[in-house]
Amino acid sequence: MKVAVLGAAGGIGQALALLLKTQLPSGSELSLYDIAPVTPGVAVDLSHIPTAVKIKGFSGENARPALEGADVVLISAGVARKPGMDRSDLFNVNAGIVKNLVQQIAETCPKACVGIITNPVNTTVAIAAEVLKKAGVYDKNKLFGVTTLDIIRSNTFVAELKGKSPSDIEVPVIGGHSGVTILPLLSQIPGVSFSEQEVADLTKRIQNAGTEVVEAKAGGGSATLSMGQAAARFGLSLVRALQGEKGVVECAYVEGDGEHARFFSQPLLLGKNGIEERQSIGKLSAFEQQAMEGMLDTLKKDITLGEEFVSK
């Protein structure tokens, strides 16, 4: 199994690469790419960690050597948020980066499963889909927006509030991956109940958690370490499913049946070909139903922005 990380010299990319080097199954290959000249050195640094995962780093304009034979590609390349910016402010720079990298994926490893981490995810996933479609290689069961950070944050905040162990909590999060489009389904956590005020406060905290980190880092970046952990969790789940493990479920932002929006984050059963089954979002509470209906316009605008970026 070969996993490629694009944007591997950045804060998220380095954290992700470290976790993959230590946790990928024995015999896996890990390929690191970034435009920055330090990237082969990051690979050498990680190569000294004693795990049976082969690692190689590539830098420069051309990502193709890193992509050859990849089964899974995780894209974290792009610029980070600074205080006062929202995820959509990143669009102007990151849209072009994602478009370029996905074109190279379409040419080099068109059958790979692709996880997009680069923000704004609501839009960059639509860009990736349109690029793959133009190249005639789009498989909607193999393209994912990685929203796992919203899930792990939800698990952490709920566990803190309720005095539970975080490993016992798993909160499904649906919708998109920014602001109001992030919708944690707090009504679906077995054995945990909340007051209306707790639901309103927790939902808001989960939606604004990225900004909490951006402000706390005081201009020094955005969430890189927790995002690295989230991306590693998603990437490792994908690898396990591709290798035949049964019952692997993760939420991610994918093209579904279009009931709510063309792309929508929902629970997915993963399998040997990527998505095996898009699972139901289940029964929503009145609060969740209202929040979902209220976000769809924002989400659809984000998606259209990505589609138009490729068609223009």
From Swiss-Prot:
Q: Name one Pfam family in it.
A: Ldh_1_C
> Which molecular function terms from Gene Ontology are attached?
L-malate dehydrogenase (NAD+) activity
Positions annotated to bind substrate = 81, 87, 119, 153
Assembly information from the UniProt record = Homodimer.
HAMAP family the UniProt entry points to: Malate_dehydrog_1
This protein's name: Malate dehydrogenase
Catalysed reactions, semicolon-separated = (S)-malate + NAD(+) = oxaloacetate + NADH + H(+)
This entry carries the following GO cellular component terms, namely: cytoplasm
> To which protein family does this belong?
Belongs to the LDH/MDH superfamily. MDH type 1 family.
Instruction: Give the Enzyme Commission number.
Output: 1.1.1.37
Broad EC category: oxidoreductase
Q: Which residues form a coiled coil?
A: none
Q: Which residues form the active site?
A: 177 (proton acceptor)
